[in-house]
Amino acid sequence: MELVLDDRQRAMLREMGVHVWMPQVDAHEAVVAERSAQLKGGGPRLGGTEQSALPARPIVNSAPAVVPLKTEGSSSTQLALHGRDWQALAAAAASCQACGLCAGRKNSTLQAPESPVQCDWLVLGDPPDEDEDRLGQPFADQAGLLLDNMLKAAGAHRGGMARAGAYVSNVVKCRPPNARLPQAAEMEQCAQYLQREIALVQPKLILAMGRFATQLLLQEHPQQAALPLGKQRGTVYRYQGIPVVVTYHPKVLLRASADKAKAWADLCLAMDIVEASLQ
């Protein structure tokens, strides 16, 4: 897609601390045409060495399809979530006791959206923190404000519809007790909720924000999942056939402003994928 920033988007990027550099028009249009052809053709092969003239637009590398998380030797409880609407799904999450995470829960962060419609964006974040647990919603407080600004710069927002819509969720719906890390079996258990969320949202793209969200979506690729998040960036993965782009969690960006430009590049890649899905 051709990235044309209006004054509002530039202001939002300044809010993120990103300095926007745009190439000369002729060069930019040439690269956009080349990238459009690549996306229509499925993108270059994994491990290709071709480089784009636009630094903020990483080349799309297609990885093998990622299937739902499965842990060897797991004995996860199969939840009866198939066919549930948003209200029933949220009620199930609020009363769920399928794993030990419920011991630390004040509120589930899986909430029925006000307008239950299809959204092109699904944003998956790390386990809920204290603010998310207290409010019962993903991406709360300053991290949530930063995410909202990032989405607005991409032309999307929470509660929007279709191309302008973004549904946000956590990799697990309950805050781990005593702020501990979630276990693999707990993430597998909660992945059943994510699979139903995906079925209801029907996203064109999943934006994985943070290392736990990324671990869930890349579990079938242990070599890639074991890499630092910074080395997982710039590649398009797939989860249940849906493109996945990896980037930093907003809480990390608030602490490390130098990574905001990298997050903007990831967002540009995500915008390209959403745009290509509409062609």
Regions found by a protein language model. Give the residues of each.
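A polyanion-binding, active-site-adjacent surface
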Residues: 2-7, 11-279
